[in-house]
Design a protein with these regions (language model features):
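A beta-strand edge to alpha-helix "cap/lid" segment located at domain peripheries
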Residues: 2-18, 79-85, 92-166
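Short, low-complexity N-terminal intrinsically disordered segments enriched in polar/charged residues
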Residues: 1-45, 49
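Soluble or luminal CAZymes and related metallo-dependent hydrolases
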Residues: 27, 69, 117
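A solvent-exposed, acidic/Ser-Thr-rich amphipathic alpha-helical stretch
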Residues: 44-98
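A short alpha-helix capping/helix-coil boundary motif
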Residues: 22-25, 53, 101-102
Length: 166
């Protein structure tokens, strides 16, 4: 095993989101961050500027290929939730890919409409030579970040979690 000092450094551009007052240095990542932080139902029409027509997208609930399917997922988000918004908290980019960490904030439409909910997650994105996203994989814990917050199901999830710890 090499001593730590003998391992050559890796060139990685660490990006700070624009929300923190610093502009990212990776143009494709900067464009994606700006797009998602300003996402509205009206801007869904601009998804083709961000994604390729054959984009692969996966999150805990969906696994799809194609721009129209991705558009459908985001349109459903606006139908099901009140005031959904993404806040990018960090970004690491290297070459043709980046990893974003983010907070997804929203209110439920059908219950507990007063409480702001936050899901913390991350996205692995791969870009084409033209800077469009061709691969988008979201990582977040649906059990902890969503199911535990739902009435009835939340109680069951917390009980199961406690049982698993024993």
């Amino acid at each position: 095993m090499k001593p730590f000092a003998a391992i050559p450094p890796v060139s990685v551009d660490t990006l700070v989101p624009a929300a923190l007052g610093m502009a990212p240095q990776h143009p494709a990542a900067a464009r994606v961050i700006a797009f998602f932080e300003a996402l509205t139902p009206a801007t869904l029409a601009q998804l083709e500027e961000i994604y390729t027509p054959q984009v692969y997208f996966k999150d805990p609930f969906n696994e799809v290929r194609g721009l129209q399917e991705v558009r459908r997922i985001f349109a459903h988000m606006y139908e099901a939730l009140e005031q959904p918004r993404f806040v990018v908290t960090d970004c690491i980019a290297q070459g043709d890919q980046c990893f974003l960490t983010w907070n997804f904030e929203f209110r439920f439409k059908n219950f507990d409409r007063t409480s702001l909910q936050t899901i913390r997650g991350g996205s692995h994105l791969k870009f084409t030579a033209g800077g469009q996203v061709d691969f988008h994989r979201d990582y977040w814990d649906a059990a902890e970040e969503l199911y535990e917050k739902l009435p009835l199901l939340g109680s069951l999830m917390r009980w199961l979690k406690e049982r698993a710890r024993r």
